[in-house]
Curated annotation (Swiss-Prot):
Belongs to the complex I subunit 4L family. It catalyses: a ubiquinone + NADH + 5 H(+)(in) = a ubiquinol + NAD(+) + 4 H(+)(out). It comes from Apis mellifera ligustica. One of its GO terms (molecular function) is NADH dehydrogenase (ubiquinone) activity. One of its GO terms (cellular component) is mitochondrial membrane. This is NADH-ubiquinone oxidoreductase chain 4L. It is a multi-pass membrane protein.
Length: 87
């Protein structure tokens, strides 16, 4: 239970800290995916669950990067570097 509380606290701290731009938010999401993957490996949960989670995390990464590239194409590099997530 303490581990879950610490992970939630880290998630909200990183979410508050990385609320600067979209790329930092994507890096935060990948950090959380790697944390959950280590949790699955550490507790030796079913290998099929590991593969399914790995497939979903790769799809999430590809979707996020494609959104970043399309936003860079539409808005331009200068506007993307100062854009906030709330925009």
């Amino acid at each position: 239970m303490k581990l879950l509380f610490v992970m939630m606290l880290l998630f909200f701290m990183f979410l508050w800290y990385y609320n600067v731009n979209f790329l930092s938010f994507l890096i935060l999401m990948e950090f959380l995916v790697i944390t959950v993957l280590f949790f699955i490996i550490g507790y030796e949960i079913n290998s099929w669950l590991f593969l399914i989670f790995l497939v979903f995390s790769v799809c999430e990464l590809v979707l996020g990067l494609s959104l970043l590239v399309s936003m860079n194409y539409e808005l331009g590099h200068q506007k993307l570097s100062v854009m906030d997530l709330i925009y």
